[in-house]
Amino acid sequence: GKLDDVIATIKQGGGFGYFPNARAWVTQYPSAALPKARKVYAQPVLNGMENGIAVMWQKCPHLGCRVPSCQSSGWFECPCHGSQYNRVGEKKGGPAPRGMDRFGVEVNGGNVVINTGLQLNGPAIGVNTTGQEAEGPHCISGEASHN
C-alpha cells in the first residue's frame, strides 16, 4: 500500500499497525535512531527504517506465539512466556533468543511492499537502537523474572 496509508494505520493503532495479509506488525521508526540502525541492520530491513517504518513478523522467535502490542507500555509483549520487545521489535526481556524477526521491505514511489517470502532473523539480544523504555505498565505480568 501507500506509505502515507501505512503511517496513518500505525497512528490509528496507537503506534502499532497490524497488516493481516502480511502477518506483520508495522511501526514508525524514528529518523533520529538511523545512525545506530545503520550499524545493526542490513538491507532490505534498513530500507524500511530509512523510510520511517519497521516491519516485524507477528510470531515470537521463542516458540512462535503471536505477539500482541501493549498500548500501556508501548512495547510488544508475548503472552505465552513473557518475552518483551520495544516498539521496533528489539528484545527487552524474556526467554526469546533475539528480537522479533523481520521481513524485507521495499518503498518505491510512495508504495510499500512487504516481502513475506524474505524472513530475516531479528536483532541480537542487547540491540536497542531507539533507546525506548517502557512507557507505562506492562500487559504481561512476571516478565522481569525471565531476563
Indicate where each model-derived feature is located.
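N-terminal pre-ligand scaffold of iron-sulfur
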Residues: 1-61, 65-70, 103-147
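Short proline/glycine-enriched turn/loop segments at secondary-structure junctions
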Residues: 91-97, 103-104
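Short cysteine/histidine-rich zinc-coordinating motifs and their immediately flanking basic loops
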Residues: 70-76, 89-93
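Extracellular/periplasmic metallocenter environments
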Residues: 59, 63, 77-88, 99
